[in-house]
């Protein structure tokens, strides 16, 4: 086995801990990182971030709205959607994890997912 060989084309990064504004699903490739921040309450707006990691390893310049990165963000969104579909199929039924299928769906408007956030919060507090 080659320890320097690539193992995954993409990896999902998931944060479902802490304040709901910090909950996010991200996808990372060798060169790019895409994050969808779904929270849109308390003055926040749902937003996307895209970083070109090989050129910007500290993630200082968000390329999500840069027209030169339109193809890259579309590709990263496809990867994101595949990881979300996997989460939807495989999420455990406790602690509100299944509700994140709605929370992280970038095509669902906040008005239709705010209840899912409340559902997640109430289920995670019932331990």
Residue ranges and their predicted role:
Residues 56:
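Intrinsically disordered, low-complexity polar regions and short flexible loop motifs
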Residues 38, 59, 63:
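Active-site-proximal flexible loops/turns
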